[in-house]
Structure formats: structure tokens, C-alpha cells
């Protein structure tokens, strides 16, 4: 995760510099060529483990069992809803090109730098979590971090200064990292070993569906009411729906693992 976040900081900033210096087509070409190293690494990999036992479960039956378990385990279901709603309504990242050009008035390089904000916040939050060790009262911290994510997104939509926008975007990344760590750990702790893969599959529906559908929602709202309104309303709805989840799922709100989680 740390390597991925560092790459997310360096990549957009470097892309912004390259686009400003050379033709954007060459930037895409360089990106395509870079995948050659990944393909080569995959070709060089050799698996030396034992052959896995054949899976005798039926696909649809296994999926239904995973959905049934996830829904009946109310704490896990609450984390799924938080994940989906936050990513569905807070799709500020897709608006960055317009925000960079029309709101904070920076060029291509400024856009690339602004794109690194969430990753910088994620790295800082990850370092703090690692330094502090155990997180207590995980349910409260989870709900608070998602609410902070929504508030940061809301004010990001109102900001017109580049540095303030960057700070708020970084704050949203930090809050998202804290909530992601807690959500993921809670799910693993509460899921039996034989259902963990199916629960993860259900989680991927929420994890992948929220951002993709959210981009469509944000685009429709932005086209009708403008980009700032789309971002602000998304952040506000995230905060309100987090409050609803806190009220609707008291067990999630009160959740605390016996020894804390990291």
C-alpha cells in the first residue's frame, strides 16, 4: 500500500511536468511502454506451491451465501454501506481537471500536483496509524473518519485557493485511509475463514461499483448545476448518510475489538 501511495504521488506530478514539456501523446506512449516491465516480471514468476484442491462449490450458490452472510452480519453490512455511499457521493477526483483549470486556475502541472493530494494525505495517515499502533473504539473512529472525509470534500468544493484545495484534498485522503484500514480489518475479524473469499467478493461489488456509479452521478449533477455544487452536495450527502448509518447500526457505532486493531 505504501509503495502504491508513493507511486500515486510521483506519477501525477511527473505526468503534469511531462505534459507541460512535451506532447501528451508521448506521455501516453511512455506509460504504455512502462507496462513492459510489469509483463516481464509476471513472465519471470514461477509458482512452486502445491496444486490447490478443486473448488466444488457452485458459483451462484456461493455468491448467494456470501450476500446472505454479509447482509445478516449487520456490522459488516454497515461498513459496506459506508464504503458505497462515501465513494458514490464524493467523487471529487473526477472533477479535478475542471477544478484545476476553472476554479483554482492552475495549468497542467498544477493539475498534476493537485492530483497527488489524496495520496499524500494517505501516506501521512498511514504513517501515523503505524506509529500509534492499536486503534481503540474502532466503530466511533470509522464513522468519524468517513464524516471527516465528507466534510473535507464539501469544503474542497467551496475552496478557490490552490493551497487550501490541496490541503483539503489531502485531508480527504487521510480520512479515507483511516476508514479503509478499519473497515477492512473489521470485515476480516468478523468473517469465518470459509466465508472470507465470498465476503471479499461482495465487498468488491461495493468497492468497485460505488466510484464508477458515483462518477456518472457527479457528471450528471455537474452538467446540471455546476462542478462546485456537485462536489459540495456530494460531501454534504456523505456526512448526512454517515449520520444515518451511525443511527441505523448501533452495533457498528459501538464496535470495539478486544485488543484493538492496527
Where do the model's predicted regions map?
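Alpha-helical transmembrane-bundle signature of multi-pass membrane transport and export proteins
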Residues: 1-262
Amino acid at each position: 500500500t505504501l509503495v502504491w501511495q508513493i507511486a500515486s504521488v510521483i506519477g501525477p506530478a511527473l505526468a503534469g511536468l511531462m505534459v507541460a514539456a512535451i506532447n501528451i501523446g508521448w506521455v501516453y506512449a511512455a506509460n504504455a511502454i512502462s507496462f513492459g516491465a510489469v509483463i516481464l516480471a509476471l513472465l519471470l514468476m514461477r509458482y512452486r506451491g502445491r496444486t490447490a484442491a478443486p473448488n466444488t462449490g457452485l458459483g451462484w450458490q456461493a455468491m448467494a451465501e456470501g450476500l446472505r452472510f454479509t447482509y445478516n452480519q449487520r456490522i459488516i453490512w454497515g461498513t459496506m454501506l459506508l464504503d458505497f455511499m462515501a465513494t458514490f457521493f464524493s467523487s471529487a477526483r473526477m472533477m479535478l481537471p475542471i477544478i484545476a483549470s476553472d476554479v483554482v486556475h492552475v495549468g497542467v502541472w498544477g493539475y498534476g500536483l493537485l492530483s497527488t493530494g489524496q495520496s499524500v494525505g494517505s501516506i501521512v495517515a498511514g504513517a501515523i496509524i503505524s506509529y500509534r499502533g492499536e486503534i481503540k473504539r474502532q466503530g466511533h473512529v470509522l464513522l468519524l473518519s468517513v464524516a471527516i472525509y465528507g466534510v473535507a470534500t464539501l469544503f474542497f468544493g467551496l475552496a478557490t485557493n490552490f493551497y487550501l484545495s490541496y490541503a483539503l484534498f489531502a485531508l480527504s485522503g487521510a480520512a479515507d485511509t483511516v476508514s479503509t484500514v478499519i473497515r477492512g480489518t473489521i470485515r476480516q475479524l468478523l468473517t469465518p475463514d470459509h466465508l472470507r473469499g465470498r465476503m471479499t467478493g461482495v465487498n468488491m461489488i461495493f468497492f468497485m461499483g460505488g466510484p464508477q456509479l458515483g462518477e456518472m452521478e457527479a457528471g450528471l449533477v455537474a452538467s446540471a448545476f455546476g462542478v462546485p455544487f456537485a462536489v459540495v452536495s456530494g460531501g454534504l450527502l456523505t456526512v448526512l448518510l454517515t449520520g444515518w448509518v451511525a443511527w441505523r447500526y448501533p452495533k457498528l457505532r459501538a464496535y470495539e475489538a478486544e485488543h484493538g486493531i492496527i
